[in-house]
Regions:
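Active-site loop-to-helix "anion-binding N-cap" substructures in soluble metabolic enzymes
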Residues: 1-207
Length: 207
C-alpha cells in the first residue's frame, strides 16, 4: 500500500531490507530468489541492484524513472548494516530524496537501514501505512485508560528487546514473554530449558 501510494503520486522507490542472519554473502538468502514473487505482488518489473556501492549500480539508480522500483540486495550481506555503521547509512541515504520506514517489527534495531539512516533525513523521513497502523493500534490501547493492560512480547533475543520490555513494564499491568527469548527468563527464574538457547549475559536483568 505504501509503495503503491508513492508510485501513484509519480515517485519512484528503492526498496531495502534483510533476510536471515548471514555472516557473509549467501546465495540462498539472496533477494534474487524472491524477486519474481515481489514482482508478481507489485505487478511490475523491478530493477535489481546487486551492490549499491559499485559505480555501475549507482548509475542504474540515478537513471530510475517515475513509477519505477529498484530492489537492493540483502543488506545483511554487508557487515556494516547490523553494526549500525554511519558511513554505510550515509551511503544508503545518498541514494534517495526521502526515507520511508514501513517495518515496525525491526524499527527497534539500531541498524544502518533503520535507526541510523533516519538521521540523514532531518526533514524528509516518514512512516509508511503499515508502521502507522501498528503504532496507532498500540497508542489506542495505551490512551484508552482501561485496565488491566496485558502485553504479549515475542522474539528470539532479549538483547534486542530489553529496552522495549522495560518501557512496556511501566505501562502494562502484566507481560507475557513468548518466543525464543522466553528461555532466558525461564533460566533466570531457575527453570529447566534443556538444550534451548539463552542469553547468559542477560540472566541478571531478566530476573
Amino acid at each position: 500500500e505504501t509503495i503503491q501510494k508513492i508510485l501513484n503520486d509519480g515517485g519512484s522507490c528503492i526498496l531495502m531490507s534483510h533476510l536471515g542472519r548471514p555472516k557473509k554473502k549467501d546465495i540462498k538468502l539472496s533477494f534474487k530468489t524472491i524477486l519474481p514473487q515481489i514482482e508478481q505482488i507489485l505487478k511490475l518489473k523491478l530493477i535489481f541492484i546487486e551492490n549499491f556501492k559499485e559505480e555501475e549500480s549507482l548509475e542504474k539508480i540515478r537513471k530510475i524513472k517515475s513509477k519505477e522500483v529498484a530492489l537492493l540486495e540483502n543488506l545483511r550481506f554487508h557487515s556494516q548494516e547490523q553494526a549500525g555503521d554511519e558511513g554505510f547509512a550515509k551511503k544508503l541515504a545518498s541514494l534517495a530524496d526521502c526515507y520511508v520506514n514501513d517495518a515496525f517489527g525491526t524499527s527497534h534495531r539500531p541498524h544502518a537501514s533503520t535507526t541510523v539512516i533516519a538521521k540523514f533525513f532531518p526533514n524528509n523521513k516518514f512512516s509508511g501505512y503499515l508502521l502507522d497502523q501498528e503504532v496507532n493500534a498500540i497508542s489506542k490501547v495505551l490512551r484508552s485508560g482501561k485496565k488491566p493492560v496485558l502485553a504479549i512480547i515475542g522474539g528470539a533475543k532479549v538483547s534486542s528487546k530489553i529496552t522495549i520490555i522495560n518501557s512496556i513494564l511501566q505501562r502494562a499491568d502484566d507481560v507475557i514473554i513468548g518466543g525464543g527469548m522466553a528461555f532466558t527468563f525461564i533460566k533466570a527464574l531457575g527453570g529447566q530449558i534443556g538444550n534451548s538457547i539463552f542469553e547468559k549475559e542477560f540472566l541478571d536483568e531478566a530476573k
